[in-house]
Amino acid sequence: MINLAAMRLFYFPKTKPGEPQQVITHPIGIGRVGWRTPEGNTRIVSKTAAPAWTPTAAIRKEHAADGDPLPKVVPPGPDNPMGTHVLRLGWPEYAIHGTDKPPSIGLRGTHGCLRMYPEDIVGIYDAVPVGAPVTVVNQPFLVGWRGDTLVMQTYPVLEDEKRKPHQRTDQLINRARKSMQGGYGARANVAVNQALVAEITQNPRAVAVPISTGNLTLQQYLAAAPRVANRLPQNATWDGDMRRQLKAADLMKKAAAP
């Protein structure tokens, strides 16, 4: 499962009967404006380690116009935009792959493919078989149940999104109220903190916030959250030096890639 608005991949490994469902999630980079990642259902049709990259005619034309002509084939190696591993989708010319530009993860920097950190793509490549179904959605607002509490998680709406999710929040909440997981009866009639819903849809934080809890504000909820220590992902190469900081313009420059 890919949620473009969240810029995250969610993998649900098969479980044995009686075992809880495990979810593995990773951040991704997605298609930039003008090169949107498609939505819908597809499958993994092939996998390749150490892939070569054959840019499409449209990509080569774009780069030539920018004074950066591309070869017909980019061989495997550290400068290959596909990274070390690729899982090709049933949609021609689209794939889930690594990258030679890690700062582009979490940004819209691709020609429609889905990029992953070099340290993340390896595990997904090894775990996901050819033929596995893939669903790509664009859902900036998510509503569900955490025990008896209705929660809402919001992400920024993509800038070229034509649909209007802000106009459908009531419909989304009502569907969650009546969901089989949430149950019927009292849960279907649970009161919703509409002021908080408005606050988190206008100021998305990607945090699941309880929206059926009195007069709670977003700041109150965040202030009460337990503090945790940030840890580097496995195999990360950052040395902890906080003095080297990239500006937004530097990140976007690094994200621009074939």
Where are these regions (language model features)?
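Short beta-strand-centered segments at strand-helix junctions
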Residues: 111-125
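Short, basic/aromatic beta-hairpin or loop at an interaction surface
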Residues: 102-112
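Structural signal for conserved beta-strand scaffold positions within catalytic alpha/beta enzyme cores
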Residues: 43-46, 115, 136
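Gly/Pro-biased beta-strand-loop elements
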Residues: 1-104, 123-127, 154-253
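Short, solvent-exposed mixed-charge patches
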Residues: 257-258
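Short, Lys/Arg- and Gly-enriched loop/turn segments at beta-strand edges
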Residues: 143-149
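Loop/turn positions that initiate beta-strands
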Residues: 131-134
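Short, charged beta-turn/beta-strand-edge "cap" motif at the junction between a beta-strand
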Residues: 35, 139-143
